[in-house]
């Protein structure tokens, strides 16, 4: 199994696959974007990872305090982190949708209905859009590990060993 949350180490073994960084995806039609142009990051910098440079500024998140948000459910790691990040930036998001999946939130944001939090790994494989503007988020809660998990004590097949050798960075 692959997941972006921490599972019980008493039950599961894991290998870290890679880091994922959450970003803010804002419909381009929102007027708040005009005041925050210096913080906007092109999708190309997300794809190549250069947005992680310290020179790329994190957006003052409370600038979006009065905007509608699409937030994942609180039992979802992305949903928990989104609420924590907003709390750390001194506001509670005006939530118009509570969803289960990042891809659904992304598609609704593309339609212009609200702002959402999205992982850079998903953006790497999502259909390209010109309907969203992306922003780097402040704080430590915007990054997490994505890991391969399996139950402790279970047999690891030769095929699984070879897959992990290929998939995991050396």
Region spans (language model):
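Structured helix-beta-strand junction loops
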Residues: 20, 66-67, 89, 111-112, ...
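Secondary-structure junction motif
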Residues: 32-33, 39-89, 156-158
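Short beta-strand-centered segments that line the small-molecule binding cleft or hinge
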Residues: 1-43, 133-135
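Conserved beta-strand segments of alpha/beta enzyme cores
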Residues: 13, 68, 92-95, 133
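Short secondary-structure boundary/capping segments
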Residues: 13-16, 38, 60-62, 87, ...
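Hydrophobic hinge/microswitch elements
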Residues: 74-130
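A late-sequence structural motif
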Residues: 120-122, 131-170
């Amino acid at each position: 199994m692959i997941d972006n949350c921490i599972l019980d180490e008493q039950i599961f073994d894991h290998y870290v696959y890679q880091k994922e960084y959450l970003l803010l995806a804002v419909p381009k039609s929102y007027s708040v974007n005009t005041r925050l142009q210096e913080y906007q990051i092109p999708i190309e910098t997300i794809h190549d990872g250069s947005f992680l440079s310290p020179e790329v500024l994190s957006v003052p998140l409370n600038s979006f305090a009065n905007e509608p948000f699409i937030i994942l459910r609180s039992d979802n790691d992305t949903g928990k982190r989104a609420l924590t990040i907003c709390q750390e930036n001194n506001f509670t998001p005006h939530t118009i949708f509570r969803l289960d999946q990042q891809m659904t939130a992304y598609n609704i944001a593309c339609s212009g209905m609200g702002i959402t939090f999205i992982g850079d790994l998903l953006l790497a494989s999502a259909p390209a859009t010109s309907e969203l503007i992306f922003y780097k988020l402040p704080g430590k809660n915007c990054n997490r590990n994505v890991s391969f998990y399996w139950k402790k004590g279970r047999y690891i097949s030769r095929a699984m060993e070879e897959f992990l050798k290929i998939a995991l960075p050396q």
